[in-house]
């Protein structure tokens, strides 16, 4: 009995184990004598010629040498696992699961020693690569193939001879070749669906953009070192996807989007650079540039072979934009504040409902319509952004143009753009500036750009541009200096007033003590240089200012809503000039200047250059040049909110003066050096709440503020039914009763019902009382004069006017006709009480 090729004869180490016995033999020779073995897992040898078939049936004796057939059958029965019925021993062999795309290789040679009982063994020889050995159960026999020629793939240590082929188990890919390949398979199925431009390099293990050759690590940090596949493993999955999203929405990526190559129109390129035919998507390969193919368990569809849905739209809009810039086939000219914009009517009609109504509806009525359209807007920059948006689909919003773009979009009836601008401004309001605010920032109000001390725009100042452009001045907590910009002060345009700091500064203010101790002289300067603009602009005589914001670290002092917002400024005893520079600007400039975020009202230091008393005296007597609201006031000429103290913060009438000379915020010529209540002069106290335009004296500051709106001529409240404008909200409520059919008024004393309000009310100023004339005569024998004297005690008053005593006659109510009463009303007898 000769020894096996790897064994040493009987029980050699190279002999296969069968049922706890070791036997040795030669390929094609006789069986060796079995020897007991007390260790190791029972392993099945490969079939010898004529051995048990793969079907699991008992082998026949015809294939064995004479005299040995019965013994081999007994040994085969002993090798069957207990409890398993009808399963061939080949089903329990250790099958190899190596290889990449073509399955397990063939073992065309002898196996290594199997006596150690370790499952992680490898074949020597054959076409396959080293791989893992797995136990194949009966449920894993899903695929098989026939192998002929040199012999089939066998278990380790078998000495099976060559000859006819045999059925051998094969299994799908168990795991990738390396960690790099495993990560690639995981990101194929998810990220490539979201980012069709994403590519993966087998050489470096890095992801990169196939359109602009940018790795996600380069997007996050340009200084990030490239260290192979470790970059792919570093960081969380969400972090890497965030980098991909950031690059996906970047401007650089969008510029290369049009240059993305469609793989379907090109040949695939292998690693060595040779051109091959495009493979089928089901083969599970990804060919990118000079990268090798990457297998996938479930196949991969090349997303780059799909046409880009936006590429045609992008190319079309880009061509139209080039035609617009070169004035090719432009059929309309848009004139905005004297500047001409060439455009195509088709693009304008498709993007704006305003132009659609103008060119489609109006064109039918007037076929001979001119090709020039004048827009009644003054925001040239905003219209330019909107026009670029119509031709590109990209809306470029910055902190400098957000409000202008929103205004133009509202005028052109582009609701989506308006909503986008609102969201942009809302997000800008949430920016906190306190940690980044410099000590001094110069804001050029013409361009609304922060300028540094040397006149150049700094990168740090640009960070807060959105903040300055979206706050209103009522929240300003800064020291404002209005620069003269080297302009000479014209004579005849300056008004001289003597100012005293005791009436301006709050008690206990730290700024007051500092200013008084240092003896600073600060004057608020205004130079009236407004020019009359021509054209169809809705707003004329507008002003522009150049402010310097000096933001101290901790100079915020919150003031109550009803308190006086007073600038803590120390003025000298001699006369100084009140000058402010004024230049023409667009109609939107009054809405953008802003201050620090989050605070309601602050102390405001008005810092300006001092003018000599001689210059101020020469320029005196020009009060008619000043319009309402040069200092915190309200007027149609003064764009509300340019100065930090609006009507909510500055209380009119606190500065006493002659009615003819006192113009909203201008300081009177005669300024008292002592508080009026210190001398006990009650008349001066009452004059503090006296209207400068009429003889009305208010009892409360808020009443005087509301009274001054009548002189301003501003009507902010509109009737929803007829569109009539009113100065106050309560006037609109009373006016709305005119449009109601059933109006029944009830006397508050005798409960008698009247159909007309004039029959119930007593007109005294703007006050109406729900008491009929009969009850008035009974309760007040003195008549109307007694009513005027005792009106505070005899009649119940409307809660809405409890502080508004003796208000002047209301001009708006006289136009209402039949509704001349402020009497309360009952809809039905015994019904609910309705207050006017």
Swiss-Prot record:
Domain of life of the organism encoding this protein: Eukaryota
Coiled-coil positions: none
Zinc finger (C2H2-type) residue numbers: 689-711, 717-739
Cellular compartments annotated: Nucleus
An example Gene Ontology CC term for this record: chromosome, telomeric region
Extent of Basic residues compositional bias: 40-50
Modified residues (Omega-N-methylarginine): 100
Cross-link (Glycyl lysine isopeptide (Lys-Gly) (interchain with G-Cter in SUMO2)), chain numbering: 182, 434, 449, 463, 536, 639, 651, 663
Alphabetical list of InterPro entries matching this protein: BTB/POZ_dom (IPR000210), SKP1/BTB/POZ_sf (IPR011333), Znf_C2H2_sf (IPR036236), Znf_C2H2_type (IPR013087), ZnFinger_BTB_dom_contain (IPR050457)
Bias (Low complexity) ranges: 73-83
Principal location listed in the UniProt entry: nucleus
Protein name: Zinc finger and BTB domain-containing protein 10
